[in-house]
Every structure is written in C-alpha cells, then in structure tokens.
C-alpha cells in the first residue's frame, strides 16, 4: 500500500469531503490497498450523483453493464459520503435479491467503521448497538435499511426535508435532496 505523509493525508481527507469522485478513489485505495482502475463512466456517475446531492436532479437512472462499479459508487460509496455530511440521513437500499442489498448495506457500514473513512468524516459514527447488516443506525439516528424487492418496507421511511440555506457545506455545497416517497 502507498504510504502518505500526515500532511498528504490531511489534504486528501479535505478533498475527499468536498469531491465525491475523489472520495470514491481515495476510499478504494485505502480499503483495497491498490489504485482503482477508473474510467470515464465512473466520473460521469459521480458527477450525476453530485447533481442529485445538490438537488439539481430529482431522479436518476444509471444504465451501464454489470461489473462496471455502479453499485460500489452509487450505493456503497454514495451512502457513506452523504452520511459523512449528514449523519442523520436515512437511506433505503432495495435490490432484486435481499442478500445483495444486505451485502451492500454491510459494505457501507464497514466503510463507516474504517480508519480511512474516519479520517475523512471523523464525526460520523455507527451506533454501538447497531450491528445488523441490513438495518443499522448512526450515532445521531441516521439509518440504512436494506431489503430485497419482495422485502417489507412498510414503516421504514427515508429522507429528510431540509432548509437548504441553513445547511450549506463549506459555503459551496448544498444539502442533500431526497427523492419523494412516491418515486
């Protein structure tokens, strides 16, 4: 694995907080131990998700073939990055198979528990009593719930309405905008 100076780590953590694309690459390097072989579509996916985060896009469909990192980027990393900015956010992840949804939720949870993530987002913590893979919470009652398409979602809401002006990030990033529940 690459060794970085403390100054480089601090600079990288700041950049990862601000730039979702850099966050994905930085977390991959620090959790997998080698550089991510990224391609143009990875940047496009990250840019599209940033438009969702900023509230510029209300619905997004990502159509790329299997094994092209869309789940790693749009589910695991995006939930982790958004929870880093708003630890009280609520996410529901549904997949065709409950086992896959649970695995993705677990990967996100493990990312939040990792040292590299805590260097980027030191104030976002998983609750100590939240060890389930498919339904877990942050220390400030944010949550991730995972289910298969035949799973039960009744009673599990996601998203929070926020005042965008009062929750600006570093004066340059607007708050997350959640899809309406009717979507």
Sequence positions of predicted segments:
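Walker A/P-loop
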Residues: 57-77
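Post-Walker A helix-loop "phosphate-sensing" segment adjacent to the P-loop in P-loop NTPases
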Residues: 81-89, 113
């Amino acid at each position: 694995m690459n060794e970085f100076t403390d100054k480089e780590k601090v600079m990288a953590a700041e950049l990862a907080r601000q730039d979702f694309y850099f966050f994905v690459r930085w977390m991959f390097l620090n959790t997998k131990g080698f550089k991510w072989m990224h391609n143009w579509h990875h940047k496009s996916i990250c840019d599209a998700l940033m438009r969702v985060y900023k509230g510029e896009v209300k619905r997004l469909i990502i159509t790329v073939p299997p094994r092209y990192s869309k789940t790693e980027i749009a589910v695991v990393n995006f939930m982790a990055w958004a929870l880093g900015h708003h630890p009280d956010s609520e996410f529901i992840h549904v997949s065709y198979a409950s086992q896959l949804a649970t695995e993705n939720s677990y990967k996100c949870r493990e990312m939040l528990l990792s040292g590299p993530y805590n260097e980027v987002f030191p104030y976002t913590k998983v609750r100590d009593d939240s060890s389930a893979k498919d339904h877990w919470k942050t220390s400030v009652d944010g949550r991730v719930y995972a289910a298969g398409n035949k799973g039960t979602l009744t009673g599990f809401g996601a998203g929070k309405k926020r005042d965008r002006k009062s929750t600006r990030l570093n004066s340059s990033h607007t708050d997350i905008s959640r899809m309406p529940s009717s979507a």
